[in-house]
Amino acid sequence: MMKELHPELRENVRLLGELLGQSIRYHLGDEIFNKIEKIRIAAKADRNAEISQRKQLKEVLSGLNDEELAPVARAFNQFLNLTNIAEQYHIVRRRAPASELVDNRLDTIEVVFDRLIGQGVSKDKFFAQLADLNLEFVLTAHPTEITRRTLIQKYDQISECLESLDRSDLLDEEYAKIVERLRRLITEAWHTDEIRYERPTAVDEAKWGFAVIENSLWQAVPDFMRQMDAALLERFGEGLPINVNPVRFASWMGGDRDGNPNVTSEVTREVFLLSRWMAADLYLRDIEALRSELSMTACNGELARASGQSREPYRKILAKLRSRLEATRAWAAEALDSTKKPAAEVLLNNAELIEPLMVCYRSLRDCGMEVIANGPLLDVIRRAQCFGLQLVRLDIRQDSERHSDVMKEICAYLGIGDYSQWTEEEKQAFLIRELEGRRPLLPKEWPASAEAREVLDTCRVVAMQPPEGLASYVISMASDPSDVLTVILLLRESGMRHHIPIAPLFETLSDLQGAADSIGRLLDLPWYREYIGGKQEVMIGYSDSAKDAGQMAAAWAQYQAQEALVKVAAKHDVKLTLFHGRGGTVGRGGGPANRAILSQPPGSVAGNFRITEQGEMIRFKFGQPKVAKQSFNLYLGAVLEASLVPPPEPEPAWREMMDKLSHLAVNSYREVVRERPGFVEYFRSATPEQELGKLALGSRPARRKASGGVESLRAIPWIFAWTQMRLMLPAWLGSDTALQTAVDDGGADTLKAMLTGWPFFETHVDMLEMVLSKVDPEIARFYEERLVKPELHPLGDELRRRAGCAVRLINELKGQDELLLDNPVFMHSLQVRNPYTDPLHFLQVELLVRDRAEGETNKETVEKALKVTMAGVAAGMRNTG
């Protein structure tokens, strides 16, 4: 039985839709408004299983003239965005009961604390784990944020208006004023071009990341710490220790150069400095507010000495800190255009920022003013511990081949051989010999190629940064110990005097299968073990492994790789941090965060968890303070629970079944994607893959190489394209054959046992179910009929049949008649969107036909409308790539 939307959510969706309709009617007139309404009503009737309106719907849309295309597309796109705003606000609204949330399995930290206490976790164990907890979100600029920042800001203001409307004490005139503000914002959004015509630069992307911190995370972090503090105090009589900071942030924006020639050493240098400038500016605002509040005269001896016996000691200390922050901000601004070294007043490490604040904090507590100490001052201390002087630590990512090419050039210039032809053992011996020695390797007047110079310039920029500004150096396609040793040597040769974690990234199926062996060989090297000081980070890639092998085989390979890495780390007495390169979509490792964490192999979390947050997911999870605070609840609660009460080991029979499923799935997936004649042509014809390149989504190219087939396409556009035509193929292809074969071979009972007894398999099946609920065979068929040549239609028939088979299998395993019965709110949310997404699909097909037709005279108008439909479908599906 379908569950309706919560009345308050339904009312907000109705209000926003009504205001949008009024705006469209006023500005475009009755004729176009009536056409839009006719399309909407026909789409809704079609979805409600009344007499099919689909033929009429297609005819109306195909009959639109070029000038009507964009307004119609924009109307449905805007409505879907407004629906998303209403849903996102509802998730965090004050009065929303847990049963009404989009995912009613969300746990707050209070619920998690109580569950852990009920399972016998002692206070000492609890606090010891909290003190050792490290949850780090790595913000990346992967090109999946399709909404312009200008519109995001308006959408945030619309959400604030919805919150204001929730007040129970509103007067009629106050209500009317808020509605008028909503009308104005929706009209502003309607008159704002939703299409980005120029790709953002890597620096633009970094600034967008800084804006998320300034507008949301800056408030959300101390708010969440207060929530944790209160929850601990209530349960244990002891709050969160002031030196415990379980949440941190890093970024790839301006640091990820893998396959992106637009991220240069100069860009990275600029981002480091902009980050320092932004941090100083934000702290200055906080310090100014604290100086206004901390007017007290009573202080302890420590503060009296530090302030020179000042009559207003707190203000005196804060004035000194303000002066140093001003100097830091001025230096960062000046250094953008020069190589000026920081003056003595410039703050260089986090301790210089935090210690003056702690002096004030200790004094207030010593003088009996705990209530003041634990006010805004504590919030600023928490921020300083989380964000530091750098605001957000930067990861550097580069392909291992780029480093090897530099070593090849160096060795050739020195006349010591062809580095690329050496065995792995020879490379290791050479690199360790150089690392143990003291003489420089790089010749002073070495005529390096432009490519080698860029790699070394990046290393020099990294070497110049304070340790607290750096997170990790991630190496793509790293399979041998020499890949890691090379980076350490190049950094040392560039002047690096401290250690930075080096994280090999394993992302293809074969890489994942060999990950533990590779790390084991690395940890077998005595020099390297001494260098890392007992800590090793490894990155697991979800996007490319799923694109390479299909979702099911990739998920099992990721699970097994983590298990094996945990054992290797334990053998060498090394603390392992697994860095999860997940995307927003299921095809790229996405899904509900807490359930994903709780389904990791036992021992793989152990208090440390790094995860990428990509593109549009940054906005959905962290774009507003209350939303960000809820995300912290989900992630931290799950990391704490997975660390203190790890899931059980899977049964041997379950492992055997997953081995079988994985083998069947990868073969089935690759048979279609790699070997099936006509598949690539079908993909490029049936989806808007080639047209996606016209969307200025991010600074990074869609392809690693200018030419090539599916293998050269990045995972994001691969997912994006299939999402647009509603086949969602990357997330389920291969799983259908694997599950069907297992059932046919008598494995249904084993699969059902796995579903109820193994969090990993349960989560995988639930994610499969969620993505299959978005598949629409009829819409996919329409794309095929209009865009694909007839001789390839049998392939489409097969794919749609297989998607239907996957749906039937999931329902059989879960003992249900239709998908999403255990997640009715998500089901209804999808069904609310469908009547608004359907016209965008049909319109997109019409536009693709026109755009691809030779002799199309109104190319610019058609392309603009096409881009709007892509944005609208992404909004309807709540993801892009």
Curated annotation (Swiss-Prot):
What's a BP term from Gene Ontology annotated to this protein?
tricarboxylic acid cycle
Q: Which cofactor does it need?
A: Mg(2+)
Query: What Gene3D superfamilies does the record tag this protein with?
Result: Phosphoenolpyruvate/pyruvate domain (1.20.1440.90)
What highest taxon heads this organism's lineage? Bacteria
- Active site location: H142, K547
Q: Which GO terms describe its cellular component?
A: cytosol
Looking up Pfam families in the UniProt record yields: PEPcase
Q: What class of enzyme is it?
A: lyase
EC annotation from Swiss-Prot or TrEMBL:
4.1.1.31
PROSITE patterns in the cross-refs: PEPCASE_1 (PS00781), PEPCASE_2 (PS00393)
Which family does the UniProt entry place this protein in?
Belongs to the PEPCase type 1 family.
Protein name per its UniProtKB record: Phosphoenolpyruvate carboxylase
